Each structure stands twice: as C-alpha cells, then as structure tokens.
Regions:
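Active-site glycine-centered loops adjacent to acidic/histidine catalytic or metal-binding residues
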Residues: 43, 86-87
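Residue-identity detector for glycine
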Residues: 1, 13, 27, 35, ...
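Binuclear metal-dependent phosphoesterase catalytic core
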Residues: 52, 57-81, 89-125
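Hydrophobic "anchor" residues on beta-strands that sit immediately upstream
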Residues: 39, 82-83
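Active-site-proximal loop/helix segment associated with metal-binding centers of metalloenzymes
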Residues: 1-62
Length: 125
C-alpha cells in the first residue's frame, strides 16, 4: 500500500473514498468566495492530465494516489486565475480550460531533472 496509509492514522474502517470525501468537505466553506482574482491551492492534483506526457509508464503507477477529479470540480466552482498544487515532484506550469496550474516542486534531492528547487513569483499586481 501507499505510504500515506501507513503514516496516517485514519479512523478504523475508513475507506479510500471516505478519506477523499472528508478532505473535500473541509473545502466546502470556501467555495462560495467570489473575488475579482482568486488564487487557489491544494496539496493534491485536481486533474491527472496536469502530469506531463514525458513521464515513463513505469512511474505512472503512482497516478491513483496523486489526486482526484472531485478536487477539480471544486477548483472550477472557485474559478481561480491560478491554482497551485503539490504532491507531484514534477514542475509544471500549464493552462487548462482558462486556469493556470502551477506545481513548483522541490522533490527529493536527487530529482534535479524534474524540479527546479527555487522559489518563483506566480502573480504580480
């Protein structure tokens, strides 16, 4: 199983879907925010197509643990100009359906070819 299941203490009998639903529910109170410009954040990927196509097939085994499309549904409700996400160790700056998605990964020390390991400015007024 994934390390997340060994390092986290979930309530006894909690299923994967219930873990997802629990964390999605924490976001509900913020989904009605309406500002001229919103920058949203999540630890997990809101959509798997944010992963670049150059990722070798043998590394795609982790894809089911990277995020959920239900998170993307919440991002769409907020309609941010930028959504910053993590969990993947692969840097990505891409626009999908009008939203700029950014992952500025630091990754593990040996992952120098997929992460820049530097701070970046994502928005200026």
């Amino acid at each position: 199983g994934w390390l997340d299941y060994h390092q986290c203490k979930w309530p006894k009998g909690f299923k994967e879907e219930e873990v997802t639903e629990y964390f999605l529910a924490l976001n509900e109170q913020y989904l009605s925010i309406k500002n001229e410009k919103i920058i949203s954040f999540s630890h997990f990927l809101p959509r798997i197509d944010l992963m670049p196509s150059f990722i070798p097939a043998n590394f795609r085994i982790v894809y089911p643990a990277l995020g959920t499309s239900h998170l993307e549904e919440q991002v769409r409700i907020l309609n941010p100009i930028i959504h910053v996400y993590g969990h993947s160790h692969v840097n990505q700056h891409i626009v999908k359906e009008g939203i700029r998605y950014i992952n500025n990964a630091y990754g593990y020390p040996h992952e120098t070819n997929i992460s820049d390991k530097q701070l970046i400015c994502i928005y200026e007024t």
